[in-house]
Amino acid sequence: MQQTKKLTQCDVTIAVMSGSFLQRGEPALVSKWYRTKMALAGGIDLVVELPYAFATQKAETFANGAISILNALGVSDICFGSEDGHVQHFYNTLSLQQKKQNTFNQLVQQYISEGNSYAKATSEAFSHILSGHDTIDMSQPNNILGLHYIQAILSQKSTIRAHTIKRFAAHYHDESFTNKHIASATSIRKQLFIGDCSFTSIYPFVPNCTSSLLEEYYHIYHVLHNWETYFPLFKYKLLTMSAKELQHIYEMEEGLEHRILAKIQNATSFLTFMEAIKTKRYTWTRLQRVCTHILTNTTKEEIKSAAIENHAPYIRLLGMSQKGQSYLSKNKKQMSLPLLTHTKTFEHPVLNIERRANAVYLSALQEPLRTKCIQQNITQYPIRYNEIDKTFL
């Protein structure tokens, strides 16, 4: 955050945040409202939601949704973390890919025919055509997402300027604490699910406000969300579905439904299930996203009828500082998308999917908190934060 503000010299900082489920194809650790509080306390002025229909997608669609929202908000600059750290390398990569598009496409098909996943095939194709140039390493996850952010800016003819900050010490997929002061989100989540959910082990790696809000959420709702939380519901759902029904689930490829139905029979946890269905053809993240769509019953037809293309249909405001509120007051009339402060009266196929995904996410809570929170997700107004007094209003 400090580096972003220094790099962009921004007046207002805006975060586009996934809701209940994440791009990796897994539930968020705590609710979007608690994560909004963490963001506001950490220095963000406006927190807006990236809808499920974009948030649980491949990098290209995820980036298109995020950039369309930022563009509608009138953002001048974006900043993302990457393993590379040089924004010009991203533009070089896109330029070379376009010049060698035919070769690139042929290589992708060749690597897929050899049994590689699409992600692995594209990574290998990039490696081949980019060798010897000042370009990015397309085997790194944050580089991949960053490339799609810039691609989205260009394809949407946006005037947004891109910046990137090099990620140091902790890597995206690190599962253990390898540095005394910096840890990956993956390692922090894993640590929280070891033993009796001890929060003290993560204190050196997260801001005080974040650890306090994590503890508060756990003490109120008695859960931190991960896939194992939902495994009983997930297994029940699969045991009551046919292969034909599974074929309609979004991102389900032909033949995968039979493997899923066969392996769920003896699976005793989500981890053992994933290990059983994992093959060279599909990445772990891709399979988790399919599982997320099964859990939320998101179908191919639904996503198609939502007609999301490259643009989000609305902006859901989750939280704002006083500075953020002032920015909205001045710029609201110029925004090219509807700004929602609640979802009581707004209707859209993307929002229908969102409501169902939220309800499924909150099924992990006990009654009466579950029903109360499901209703609050619809009626909740944005969280307001006084950045001077550091208090929520």
From Swiss-Prot:
GO MF entry, a single one: ATP binding
Reactions the enzyme catalyzes: cytidine(34) in elongator tRNA(Met) + acetate + ATP = N(4)-acetylcytidine(34) in elongator tRNA(Met) + AMP + diphosphate
Keywords linked to the UniProt accession: ATP-binding, Cytoplasm, Ligase, Nucleotide-binding, RNA-binding, tRNA processing, tRNA-binding
GO cellular component: cytoplasm
Principal subcellular localisation of the protein: cytoplasm
Entry binding sites for ATP: G81, N142, R167
Cellular localization per UniProt: Cytoplasm
One Pfam family in the UniProt entry: HIGH_NTase1
Coiled-coil region list: none
Top EC class, one word: ligase
E.C. number: 6.3.4.-
Single GO biological process annotation from the record: tRNA modification
Role played: Catalyzes the formation of N(4)-acetylcytidine (ac(4)C) at the wobble position of elongator tRNA(Met), using acetate and ATP as substrates. First activates an acetate ion to form acetyladenylate (Ac-AMP) and then transfers the acetyl group to tRNA to form ac(4)C34.
Cross-referenced NCBIfam families: PRK13670.1
Family membership: Belongs to the TmcAL family.
Protein name: tRNA(Met) cytidine acetate ligase
High-level lineage: Bacteria, Bacillati, Bacillota, Bacilli, Bacillales
